[in-house]
Amino acid sequence: KCFEVGEFCGSPMLLGSLCCYPGWCFFVCVG
């Protein structure tokens, strides 16, 4: 899972987490 900005994630994350798409985390997914 992705919790920190700049962390890499390889799969879509759940609502409320820092990523909603594969890649680098830069925002919180809200919808």
Curated annotation (Swiss-Prot):
GO terms for cellular component: extracellular region. Disulfide bonds join 2-20, 9-25, 19-29. It comes from Conus pictus (Cone snail). It is found in: Secreted. Belongs to the conotoxin O1 superfamily. GO terms for molecular function: toxin activity. Keywords: Disulfide bond, Knottin, Secreted, Toxin. Expressed by the venom duct. This is Conotoxin pc6d. The cysteine framework is VI/VII (C-C-CC-C-C). The presence of a 'disulfide through disulfide knot' structurally defines this protein as a knottin. The keyword Signal does not apply.
